[in-house]
Regions:
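N-terminal secretory signal peptides
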Residues: 1-13, 17-27
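Boundary at the C-terminal end of the N-terminal hydrophobic targeting segment
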Residues: 33-37
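Local sequence-structure signature of Cys/Sec-based thiol-disulfide redox active-site neighborhoods
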Residues: 38-53
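Stable alpha-helical elements in mature extracytoplasmic
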Residues: 47, 54, 69-72, 104-108
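Conserved helix-turn-beta segment immediately C-terminal to the redox Cys motif
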Residues: 56-67
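Thiol-based oxidoreductase modules, predominantly thioredoxin-like and allied folds used
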Residues: 65-76, 86, 94
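Thiol/selenol-based redox catalytic cores and closely related redox-interacting motifs
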Residues: 85-169
Length: 171
């Protein structure tokens, strides 16, 4: 009977490897395998609902996520050397990169694949429709236009990817 029992953590590891393997077959190995093998460490406040939804978005997209509840993320950004003007409600670290705000998982994968000389990615201002900020009720499916910024080592930024607005559906 014991040999039929698989620990929950072992099941998760097997599932991650299977997902990474399927992704590697269809997308190439570099970005999917790297993302599945890396752990994203997230600092957020314990009561922030959108942070929890963003973490779920990352997990759904194959990332291993460790969360740390803090009263304020400002000190973490400062410790990581990430410019405060890009600050949002949560801060994450993945390898050498900082991820700030509601950055989509696909953009994190592209960052890992391209490996630019940069501090990381940021989505300031918590735009409606970004991962973790999906609207509900009358705002379901609505997205404000927003940019994912590549924050360079000198503290400047450039647009990494732009997302167009999706207006509300008129009934």
């Amino acid at each position: 009977m014991k040999h039929h029992l698989i620990h929950k953590a072992s099941r998760r590891s097997v599932l991650r490897l299977a997902v990474a393997g399927l992704g590697a077959v269809s997308l190439g190995t570099s970005s999917v395998a790297y993302a599945a093998a890396e752990t994203i460490t997230v600092w957020k406040t314990p009561t922030c609902g959108c942070c929890k939804v963003w973490v779920a978005h990352l997990r759904k997209n194959g990332f291993d996520v460790v969360t740390n509840d803090v009263s304020d993320t400002t000190a973490i950004r400062k410790k990581l050397g990430f410019p405060e003007q890009f600050g949002s409600c949560h801060t994450a670290k993945l390898g050498e990169y900082v991820i700030e705000g509601h950055v989509p998982a696909e953009d994190i994968r592209k960052l890992l694949q391209d490996k630019p000389q940069a501090r990381g990615l940021a989505v300031p201002n918590m735009p409606l429709g970004s991962p973790g900020m999906e609207g509900i009720g009358t705002n379901a499916g609505v997205r404000q236009a927003y940019n994912v910024l590549l924050v360079l080592n000198d503290g400047s930024s450039r647009v990494f990817k732009s997302y167009a607005a999706i207006p509300p559906v008129k009934t």
